[in-house]
C-alpha cells in the first residue's frame, strides 16, 4: 500500500485483519539497518534473541496473522551489519518463506500462511527485487468532501472521547463550514493526520473552558469561533482552486 502520509495505509491493514478475522501485528521498518533484526542473533552472542519477524509472530499468537511491514521504503540498504532488504526478500518471496531461517532458533519457520501487507510513501525508494514480490496498490489522498466525512464520522467522535467532553450534549454542533475551514485553512496535506491534530487542539481548548466555566464554552463551532480558538489560519485557499486553468 503506497501513498502520501496520513491517508490511512496502516489503518487499512488493520481493517484487512478484522475483515478476515485474523490476528493483527505491526512492525515498523523505519531506520532498520541491521540484518540480524530480521533474522535474529546467533546464540553465541551476548544478549542474543530471535529476530523481529519471529518475535512478532509469537506476539500475535498465530501462524497466519496479517503482518504489517510499516514504512518499508525507509529500510537502510547495504550496511556493514548485513543488508536488511535482502533478509526481507526471504520473508516476502513465496518460493522461500515456507522455510524462513531464524539464526536464534537455528531452525526454519513456515511464514507462507502469513499475509504480509507493506506500507510506503515512496515506492521508488524500495529495492527493485523487493518491489517485484509485491502487489502494488495506490492509496491516494482525499478531497475536501471526503475529509469532511472522515472528520465528522471518525475523528471528531474519537477526539471528543479523548478530551472528556460531553459527546451527547444536544446543543453541541460542529458545522460543515467549520470542518471545511479547518481543512482548507489550518491544514495542507493529502491525508488527515494534521486535521486530527487540529481537531484535538480545538477540543482541548473547549475542554479547558468547560473545566473553568463548568459549562460547554461553545454550543456551536462555526468558522468565526474556529478563528477565536485557533487563531489566524496559516493557509489560505488558492484563488484559482477549482478553476479549469
Show where each model-derived region lies.
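Walker A/P-loop
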Residues: 1-29, 58-59, 89, 93
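The Walker A (P-loop) glycine that initiates the GxxxxGKT/S ATP-binding motif of P-loop NTPases
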Residues: 3, 40, 71
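Short loop/turn elements that form and flank the Walker-type P-loop nucleotide-binding site
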Residues: 7, 20-21, 39, 47, ...
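AAA+/P-loop NTPase substrate/partner-engagement loops
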Residues: 18-49, 56, 76, 146
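AAA+/SF3 P-loop NTPase mechanochemical coupling elements
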Residues: 60-68, 100-120, 170-173, 219-221
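Conserved C-terminal "switch" segment of AAA+ ATPases
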Residues: 61, 122-132, 136-197, 205-218
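Conserved catalytic/switch belt of AAA+ P-loop NTPases
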Residues: 69-109, 113
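C-terminal engagement/docking regions of AAA+ P-loop ATPases
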Residues: 193, 197-245
Amino acid at each position: 500500500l503506497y501513498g502520501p502520509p496520513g491517508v490511512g495505509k496502516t489503518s487499512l491493514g488493520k481493517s484487512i485483519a478484522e475483515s478476515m478475522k485474523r490476528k493483527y501485528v505491526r512492525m515498523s521498518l523505519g531506520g532498520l539497518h541491521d540484518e540480524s533484526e530480521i533474522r535474529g542473533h546467533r546464540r553465541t552472542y551476548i544478549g542474543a534473541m530471535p529476530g523481529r519477524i519471529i518475535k512478532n509472530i509469537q506476539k500475535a499468537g498465530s501462524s497466519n496473522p496479517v503482518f504489517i511491514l510499516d514504512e518499508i521504503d525507509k529500510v537502510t540498504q547495504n550496511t556493514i551489519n548485513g543488508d536488511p532488504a535482502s533478509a526481507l526478500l526471504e520473508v516476502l518471496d513465496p518460493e522461500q518463506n515456507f522455510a524462513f531461517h531464524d539464526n536464534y532458533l537455528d531452525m526454519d519457520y513456515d511464514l507462507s500462511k502469513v499475509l504480509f501487507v507493506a506500507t510506503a510513501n515512496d515506492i521508488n525508494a524500495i529495492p527493485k527485487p523487493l518491489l517485484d514480490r509485491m502487489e502494488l496498490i495506490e492509496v491516494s489522498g482525499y478531497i475536501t468532501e471526503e475529509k469532511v466525512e472522515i472528520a465528522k464520522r471518525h475523528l471528531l467522535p474519537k477526539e471528543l472521547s479523548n478530551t472528556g467532553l460531553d459527546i451527547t450534549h444536544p446543543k453541541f454542533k460542529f458545522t460543515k463550514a467549520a470542518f471545511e475551514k479547518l481543512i482548507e485553512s489550518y491544514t495542507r496535506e493529502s491525508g488527515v493526520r494534521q486535521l486530527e491534530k487540529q481537531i484535538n487542539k480545538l477540543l482541548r481548548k473547549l475542554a479547558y473552558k468547560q473545566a473553568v466555566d463548568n459549562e460547554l464554552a461553545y454550543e456551536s463551532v462555526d468558522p468565526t469561533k474556529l478563528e477565536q480558538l485557533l487563531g489566524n489560519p496559516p493557509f489560505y485557499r488558492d484563488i484559482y482552486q477549482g478553476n479549469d486553468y
